Amino acid sequence: MSGKTKRLMVMAGGTGGHVFPGLAVAHHLMAQGWQVRWLGTADRMEASLVPQHGIEIDFIKISGLRGKGLMAQLTAPIRIYRAVRQAQKIMRDYQPNVVLGMGGYVSGPGGLAAWLCGVPVVLHEQNGIAGLTNRWLARIAKKVLQAFPGAFPNADVVGNPVRTDVLALPLPAVRLSGREGPIRVLVIGGSQGARILNQTLPLVAASLGEQITLWHQVGKGALPEVSQAYQQAGQAGHLVVEFIDDMAAAYAWADVVVCRSGALTVSEVAAAGLPAIFVPFQHKDRQQYWNALPLEKAGAAKIIEQPQFTATSVSSLLASWDRATLLSMAERARSVAIPDATERVAAEVVAASKSA
């Protein structure tokens, strides 16, 4: 297909941690003249989000098996076979030069279909420990990439593509220069909130008083309850919101962030150059722990496992950090970021298209 417009099929779905990095790479390649389509599922966030970015999307029918009953397990081979056949038809119609797998259930059937159609697969693992689908697809992928070291033994570490407005933030030494007053604590619960953060931070605010000021994003439906908790703690002066539309502005405001350690969050915190207290979601694979570990090892963050995340432990930690310490941690966070992750992933897609 030399001389013709190059075509990319992005496979990603389910969560923002899969979809947003895929969109970053898609836009980068579209700016270079590539044509991009998306493979997803009709009942997850990509169905509405991807078309908003001017990218056409095709759907296959597939869902996860974890936590499903015996009947779902028994019928899984049939459903996977049907999903692969659906994806094969889409691949034959679109004829992509390369398929980029960014994670989610759709990547399994989609990646196998691409391989059966002779289309090279570039795989990107966002988390510090590889998911089951990507571990399986790595055997047939043309190139395997990872955001954090350790997910695959021999894969290139390229980081996670993050939003350009976060990458454009001033370096910590510039952003934090001359700051005085209470330490600014940004609390990010995610779109669904994090109950442990919502329960604990009002008590931390009461413990530390005027030493800190908080901007607390509580998640969908949690605003009345958490606002009341701050009021009952005598801490009604903090900013408590359901969502934050401009995360770059929030990062720019903050001196330190308290949050879960999803792959994209960790990558954004590093790119912004922010110290962090990470509270990994308790999952049997411990993905979020492994995501946060490189920043803790770099001296840029502390990990507090959920059972140990108490008002006492958090208050003690925050009280031990002065502005000089926070600046040092911020600079270490920025030093381990990979700000050109989008370009690195895109370059591997281009390379795979040339060797196809």
Swiss-Prot record:
It is a peripheral membrane protein. One of its GO terms (cellular component) is plasma membrane. GO terms for biological process: carbohydrate metabolic process; cell division; cell wall organization; lipid glycosylation; peptidoglycan biosynthetic process; regulation of cell shape. It catalyses: di-trans,octa-cis-undecaprenyl diphospho-N-acetyl-alpha-D-muramoyl-L-alanyl-D-glutamyl-meso-2,6-diaminopimeloyl-D-alanyl-D-alanine + UDP-N-acetyl-alpha-D-glucosamine = di-trans,octa-cis-undecaprenyl diphospho-[N-acetyl-alpha-D-glucosaminyl-(1->4)]-N-acetyl-alpha-D-muramoyl-L-alanyl-D-glutamyl-meso-2,6-diaminopimeloyl-D-alanyl-D-alanine + UDP + H(+). Its EC number is 2.4.1.227. Keywords: Cell cycle, Cell division, Cell inner membrane, Cell membrane, Cell shape, Cell wall biogenesis/degradation, Glycosyltransferase, Membrane, Peptidoglycan synthesis, Transferase. It is an enzyme of class 2 (transferase). Pfam families: Glyco_tran_28_C, Glyco_transf_28. The keyword Methyltransferase does not apply. It is found in: Cell inner membrane. UDP-N-acetyl-alpha-D-glucosamine binds at T15, G16, G17, N127, R163, S191, I244, A263, L264, T265, V266, S267, E268, Q288. GO terms for molecular function: UDP-N-acetyl-D-glucosamine:N-acetylmuramoyl-L-alanyl-D-glutamyl-meso-2,6-diaminopimelyl-D-alanyl-D-alanine-diphosphoundecaprenol 4-beta-N-acetylglucosaminlytransferase activity; undecaprenyldiphospho-muramoylpentapeptide beta-N-acetylglucosaminyltransferase activity. Pathway: Cell wall biogenesis; peptidoglycan biosynthesis. Cell wall formation. Catalyzes the transfer of a GlcNAc subunit on undecaprenyl-pyrophosphoryl-MurNAc-pentapeptide (lipid intermediate I) to form undecaprenyl-pyrophosphoryl-MurNAc-(pentapeptide)GlcNAc (lipid intermediate II). Belongs to the glycosyltransferase 28 family. MurG subfamily. This is UDP-N-acetylglucosamine--N-acetylmuramyl-(pentapeptide) pyrophosphoryl-undecaprenol N-acetylglucosamine transferase.
